[in-house]
């Protein structure tokens, strides 16, 4: 039996099953392996309030969208537009909520004049960041704030910061002034909550900071599954992803209290995260508040505030692309929102190396090519052993077929004869298998590196490839991949089974069809890898691994 071919068939079968499983999840069906990781089918997420679950305690659940209350408000809310070098956005004076945020340096990948909108409050999509007070009838995100010192709302000229402040009405003897600080070139927003006790008795409020999002799936490459949902990070339990489906069932498992870390909403390429001050005690919550609406947040108690006194609660809000080096400098563990899945331990060093190569060549496409060359060079000894074994197996294939034909009625004698042939010719049937198996985790890791890296968005390579995160517009790379797979197949030993031989010829067609829909960066990697493999195999089999044929 050809062990290497069997291993390849197992890999092919597992790949097909995993691709089908991704298709299941992308269409809102349960995963065959991880039932809790199902993509919830996209649905309109309006602003109707839901019933607050016990997880978030008394955090108000209303005002999730543009129409938060069925009762006509006493004051009319407005949308205050602002602009910096990295953001265009809107702050809703109802709650002083950050209701819209467009990333001006991240194109939408389809139209050159449009950009990625992260936070939004349209009829079909809700994603926002908001804060408020608990512990009494204090101002929260349902109350209409007033903009203080209205004036310039744009970061212009030589200014490095833009501050926008909003004041709440007095409720429960408390007034809140919320200030957003935007810094040039930064995706980190400073959020300062000043609590003034204008009453006659001490107050002990709790500040809540939360991210609210519907379960509308973001667009990802076909046959590829990336995480969408809340996440929590603490020093004790590190990175904890929370599936929407677990929140649906009230079965989410995550750390509920800490004095460090952050909470986030994660999607493909982009994330947002509340980062409270380190050392400040806080409770952590995540819950479903509407049929299609979820939230994750923290509740941070404030020490008693005497009449006439005030307290400041400072936090940071990250909202932007999942650029690994940038995230590492913002908060511990924040780079983990860039989801490599179970291959993180290998993927992170690979991305580091890819990034270093890009620093020299200045083009992500050529960086992928050079990284693939480097990996093939590192694994050359293993590949040489594999191809030598394949070359020897190919040389003795006619003799193996003759033995199978001679002893086809007696499987035991056939196996004994084959083993004797292997021993005589010093051929290890497992010799071509182990080197391939060892390399598989590295190639899978590189796949996830290229799939998860926002740096590929809008990154050109050459000529017709203008965006490595999008599929090849002319399908040139998938065709080249199919051709390279056919060439590889022709270099391998011919399977003795005619049916198996036909299936091996069909594999390049099946894989090339799938790769027609893969991002160009991924296909580029596989094409280069195949071409290098062909060159290695040809060189080794012709120059190093040749064996003279012997009669059966």
Swiss-Prot record:
Subcellular location: Cell inner membrane
Membrane topology of this protein: Multi-pass membrane protein
Membrane among keywords: yes
GO cellular component, one term: plasma membrane
Entry's transmembrane regions: 7-24, 364-384, 434-454, 473-493, 508-528
Matching CDD domains: 5TM_YidC_Alb3, EcYidC-like_peri
Alphabetized GO MF terms: membrane insertase activity
Keyword annotations from UniProtKB, A to Z: Cell inner membrane, Cell membrane, Chaperone, Membrane, Protein transport, Transmembrane, Transmembrane helix, Transport
Record text on subunit structure and interactions: Interacts with the Sec translocase complex via SecD. Specifically interacts with transmembrane segments of nascent integral membrane proteins during membrane integration.
Protein family per UniProt: Belongs to the OXA1/ALB3/YidC family. Type 1 subfamily.
Protein name stated in the entry: Membrane protein insertase YidC
Gene transcribed to yield this protein: yidC
């Amino acid at each position: 039996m050809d062990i290497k071919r069997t291993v390849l068939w197992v890999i092919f079968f597992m790949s097909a099953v995993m691709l089908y499983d991704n298709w299941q999840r992308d269409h809102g069906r349960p995963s065959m392996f991880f039932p809790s990781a199902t993509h919830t089918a996209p649905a309109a997420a309006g602003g109707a309030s839901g019933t607050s679950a016990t997880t978030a305690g008394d955090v108000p659940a209303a005002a999730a969208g543009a129409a938060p209350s069925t009762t006509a408000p006493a004051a009319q809310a407005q949308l205050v537009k602002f602009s910096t070098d990295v953001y265009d956005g809107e702050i809703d004076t109802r709650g002083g909520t950050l209701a819209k945020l467009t990333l001006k340096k991240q194109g939408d990948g389809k139209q050159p004049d449009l950009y990625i909108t992260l936070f939004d409050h349209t009829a079909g999509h809700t994603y926002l960041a908001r804060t408020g007070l608990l512990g009494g009838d204090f101002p929260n995100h349902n109350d209409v704030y007033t903009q203080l010192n209205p004036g310039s709302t744009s970061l212009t000229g030589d200014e490095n910061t833009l501050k926008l402040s909003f004041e709440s009405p007095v409720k429960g003897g408390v007034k809140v002034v919320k200030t957003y600080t935007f810094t040039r070139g930064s995706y980190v927003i400073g959020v300062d909550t000043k609590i003034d006790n204008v009453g006659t008795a001490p107050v002990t409020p709790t500040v809540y900071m939360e991210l609210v999002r519907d379960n509308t799936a973001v667009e990802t490459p076909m046959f590829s599954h990336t995480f969408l949902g809340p996440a929590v990070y603490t020093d004790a339990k590190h990175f904890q992803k929370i599936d929407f489906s677990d929140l649906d069932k009230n079965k989410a498992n995550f750390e509920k209290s800490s004095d460090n870390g952050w909470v986030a909403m994660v999607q493909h390429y982009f994330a947002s995260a509340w980062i409270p001050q380190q050392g400040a005690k806080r409770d952590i919550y995540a819950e479903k508040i509407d049929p299609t609406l979820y939230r994750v947040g923290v509740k941070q108690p404030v020490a008693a505030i005497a009449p006439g006194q005030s307290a400041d609660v400072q936090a940071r809000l990250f909202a932007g692309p999942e650029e690994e080096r940038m995230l590492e400098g913002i908060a511990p563990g924040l780079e983990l929102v860039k989801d490599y899945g179970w291959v993180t331990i290998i993927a992170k060093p690979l991305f580091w190396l890819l990034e270093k190569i890009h620093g020299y060549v200045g083009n992500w496409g050529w960086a992928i090519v050079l990284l693939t060359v480097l990996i093939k060079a590192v694994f050359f000894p293993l590949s040489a052993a594999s191809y030598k074994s394949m070359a020897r197996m190919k040389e003795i294939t006619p003799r193996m077929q003759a033995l199978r034909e001679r002893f086809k009625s007696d499987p035991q004698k056939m196996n004994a004869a084959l083993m004797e042939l292997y021993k005589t010719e010093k051929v290890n049937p497992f010799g071509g298998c182990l080197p391939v198996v060892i390399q598989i985790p590295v190639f899978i890791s590189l796949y996830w590196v290229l799939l998860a890296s926002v740096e590929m968005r809008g990154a050109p390579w050459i000529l017709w490839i203008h965006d490595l995160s999008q599929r090849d517009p002319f399908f040139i790379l998938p065709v080249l991949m199919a051709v390279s797979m056919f060439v590889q197949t022709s270099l391998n030993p011919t399977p003795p089974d005619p049916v198996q031989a036909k299936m091996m010829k069909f594999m390049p067609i099946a894989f090339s069809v799938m790769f027609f829909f893969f991002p160009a960066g991924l296909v580029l990697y596989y094409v280069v890898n195949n071409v290098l493999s062909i060159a290695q195999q040809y060189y080794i089999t012709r120059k190093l691994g040749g064996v003279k044929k012997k009669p059966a």
